[in-house]
Amino acid sequence: MLRLPRITRRALSSGALAPHFDRPLPPPPPAPPAPLCALPPLTAPDALAPLTRRTVRHADALVARIAAAPAHPDPAELRRVVKNLDRLSDVLCGVIDMCELVRNVHPDPHWVAAAEKTYETLCSFMNQLNTSTGLYDALVATVSHTFPGNPLSPAELRVAQTFLSDFERSGIQLPPGVRAKFVRHSDNILSLGRTFLSFAAAGPSADTPIEIPEPEVLLAGLSSKFVASLPRKKRKGPALLAPGSWEAQMIGRYADNEEARRLVYIGSMREDKDRVYVLETMLKERAELAHVLGKETWADVALSDKMAKTPQNVLQFLTSLATHHRPSAAADVAALQRLKALSTVSRTSSQLPTVHAWDRDHYAEQYAASLLPNGSLPSITPYFSVGTAMSGLSHMLSRLYGISFKPVSVAHGEVWHPSVRRLDVMDEHGKRIGVIYCDLFSRPGKPSAGAAHYTVRCSRRVDDDPSEGDGLPPGWDQHLGKGMEVQGEALHGKEGKYQLPIVVLTTDFGTVEESGPALLGWNDLETLFHEMGHAIHSMIGQTEFHNVSGTRCATDFVELPSILMEHFISSPAVLSTFATHYTTNEPLPIPLIQAHLQLDQSLKALETHSQILMALLDQKYHSIKHGEQLDSTRVWNELQSQVGVIPPVRGTAWQTQFGHLYGYGATYYSYLFDRAIAGKIWSSLFARGRTGPAAANHDPAAAEDILSREGGEAFKEKVLKWGGGRDPWEMVGDVIGGAEGEQVAKGDEKAMELVGRWMIK
């Protein structure tokens, strides 16, 4: 059994890591600008156009080489097809993924515009390659060949199968004219999806302000100063609010008058016909694309290579969860109803009043206060500066996986804003294994779409690239500038040299001032640990092949490492190892941790049921068939009436703010699915009997058991290191072990049922 020295606070001293995040950084010394993210081609916005041309030229050469491989006289060239396809994917994705970051986070509109253009060009180019019969035929010939004495490895076969699935999902076996339809529909979906996401990120339309008549009366419960600060139509006229604004949120949460809350809710969720049209057109385009591919629905297409496999399996999983959770969610609503009854002075009926959507936040706030002896809790934010949390993360990861964070100063021009910090991820041998850029702090104009993890570059082995056979003449790129290729670095325990991963985490955690650090609330802390779970998957999942590296795995598996990280941060024993007051250095009192964790669990059934509803909505929207009409608002209202515990609100169209409908189309269930698996792994590997009161034990032995290297190594070796290079069902079965592990490893309907039971437990 692997054991590390007993945890002490001295061992967890923050060193240089906490100041790296908790103090303003001095500007880098004057020097010629470095390229963005230290990637040589990214010197200026106008460098993206030649990089795009270079990328297409290199990709064209690789396509020609791969397509010619079956007719090549040397069988070794056919043997290289999987490697060369992976190189082709890396050449394109290395630029596309970088542009995805730039167009979402860069404050310079010139960079954003250039990235948008490159992104569109290369995504369209990639969609065309997905229908290339030359590439597909070469891959089929490769996997059909025996290659005596040098067969394809399991990793190569996994990568090949991933590419074959991509081709077949793109209708590769269809006639040429039909394949052209695939490209057209895919381009339409890409364009509509981007528009839909921009609407969702922007929040409710502000074209028509919310009007609150007689604000002095309707806004009782809010301070007179707040009410007086609201703009008016005229001196004694109604107060005007921007939908979704901070002021609107304050009224929705704290106004005692139900009519005020109702006006704000409807105004913030009102139906915008243009936005509804974009969503419904995108969903219909997906249904049309499914029809082109010979599938009934987009859900059939999207789930064919996921763990769940079919829409029927997903619906069974979600329906069983909804049936199980609905009584508990209804009990949560009943608690809110009782609070509403107490505040409804004129009520004459003995029946409890209905809790509407505009009541939920208001009475949830009151319910939380009712659980506390004095109506409130001392804040925990002073114990969680960003630097303290990062130090705790680094030490936790060191104990579990043998990796840690090293703060690194950035060069002038390396990052898109001075507040961005760089971390090098180090192994136990002092070797860098990757880079994380942390864009964690608020700034004017920063996109407010929430936290995100961007993979700028995936890992892959590069020293065995057969680039001499690409058919490109010497100096072919001289007029196009540098590419994204690297020489690679040696990694401990791995043969060859690897391209190291680069990831970016973005959040909105306040600002660092000379007067003090940015402090994290509980939700912020969960967000940081969750997003870091994705980053660590990228760092540890360094496979030989780009296409299965790190987070490039099934959508309904990719959230597992991140949700597992949430379990660690919910452990008082783990929190007690690093949470200290940013001014006094006093440890966070354990009773305060426990009280906040208990508060965080209040109304949890209602929140879980809301997630189930959203996942069901995603399935319903993506289960429409070719030619079917769709009224997305009617579908949402019916679902709330049939399965929900809070009635729908007519005249609203919340679904246009559900941005995950694009990125997670038909796979939003993944959060619930991976939560079930993460809970099982947590109890099997890490908690091991420390559930309930035992989990609150905060002596060093409790932390040692939870942060056990034995458990960390098991998860690292059986899950994280594989990225997407192994069947996820087999990974889950391997890490769970025993009879349940054997059953779940089969990945059949019974395995799905078993995961559902884990969630219910």
Swiss-Prot record:
Q: What is its main location?
A: mitochondrion
* Cofactor(s) listed in the protein's UniProt record: Zn(2+)
Q: Where does Zn(2+) bind?
A: 530, 534, 537
Q: Would you say which domain of life the source belongs to?
A: Eukaryota
A GO-annotated cellular component:
mitochondrial matrix
Q: Name one Pfam family in it.
A: Peptidase_M3
For this chain, one GO molecular function annotation is: metalloendopeptidase activity
Q: Which UniProt keywords apply?
A: Hydrolase, Metal-binding, Metalloprotease, Mitochondrion, Protease, Transit peptide, Zinc
The EC number on file is 3.4.24.59
Could you give a single Gene Ontology term from the biological process aspect? protein processing involved in protein targeting to mitochondrion
Q: Report the cofactor remark.
A: Binds 1 zinc ion.
Reactions this protein catalyses: Release of an N-terminal octapeptide as second stage of processing of some proteins imported into the mitochondrion
Q: What does this protein do?
A: Cleaves proteins, imported into the mitochondrion, to their mature size. While most mitochondrial precursor proteins are processed to the mature form in one step by mitochondrial processing peptidase (MPP), the sequential cleavage by MIP of an octapeptide after initial processing by MPP is a required step for a subgroup of nuclear-encoded precursor proteins destined for the matrix or the inner membrane.
Q: Which family does it belong to?
A: Belongs to the peptidase M3 family.
Can you name this protein?
Answer: Mitochondrial intermediate peptidase 1
Organism listed in the record: Cryptococcus neoformans var. neoformans serotype D (strain B-3501A) (Filobasidiella neoformans)
Give the gene that encodes this protein.
OCT1
